[in-house]
Curated annotation (Swiss-Prot):
Pfam families: Oxidored_q6. Keywords: 4Fe-4S, Cell inner membrane, Cell membrane, Iron, Iron-sulfur, Membrane, Metal-binding, NAD, Quinone, Translocase, Transport, Ubiquinone. It is a peripheral membrane protein. It comes from Herminiimonas arsenicoxydans. SUPFAM superfamilies: HydA/Nqo6-like. This is NADH-quinone oxidoreductase subunit B.
Length: 158
């Protein structure tokens, strides 16, 4: 958080936008939407070796408690309405991370009749994490990119 000025009396001044965005980046609660093998890497990123808790990332089981959705794996046509329904149940502000080649653009199954060619056709995606499957480090980098994106947004309308 950028501090605008520190006064001699011990006060810290900053803008409300920067304060709100600082709290949002330090307490991101993702809801996992694991569909295929990328979900294993997502679980690996949440385990003790990578420990996403140090970034303020705590996995939540309910869409009403989460503000980030991680779509990991192959999205089929049959699962697309469920993805949209879960996304609509999330409270604002909400963000989406697309994890893996299949979630990004269909991946290996791109030409299959039953595969959605990218989850961005169903929900708006903020960060794309490439790979088949992407490593836990790649997901952590994607989370850091999302935190940078949140820091740059204007929260309070002017």
């Amino acid at each position: 958080m950028a501090i605008e000025g520190v006064l001699n009396e011990g006060f810290v001044t900053t803008t409300a936008d920067k304060l709100i965005n600082w709290t949002r980046t330090g307490s991101m609660w993702p809801m996992t939407f694991g569909l295929a093998c990328c979900a294993v890497e997502m679980m690996h990123a949440g385990a003790s070796r990578y420990d996403m808790d140090r970034f303020g990332v705590v996995f939540r089981p309910s869409p009403r408690q989460s503000d980030v959705m991680i779509v990991a794996g192959t999205l089929c046509n049959k699962m697309a309405p469920a993805l949209r329904k879960v996304y609509d149940q999330m409270a604002e502000p909400r963000w989406v991370i697309s994890m893996g080649s299949c979630a990004n653009g269909g991946g290996y199954y791109h030409y299959s009749y039953s595969v959605v060619r990218g989850c961005d056709r169903i929900v708006p995606v903020d960060v794309y994490v490439p790979g088949c499957p992407p490593t836990a480090e790649a997901l952590l980098y994607g989370i850091m990119q999302l935190q940078n994106k949140i820091r740059r947004t204007n929260t309070i309308a002017r």
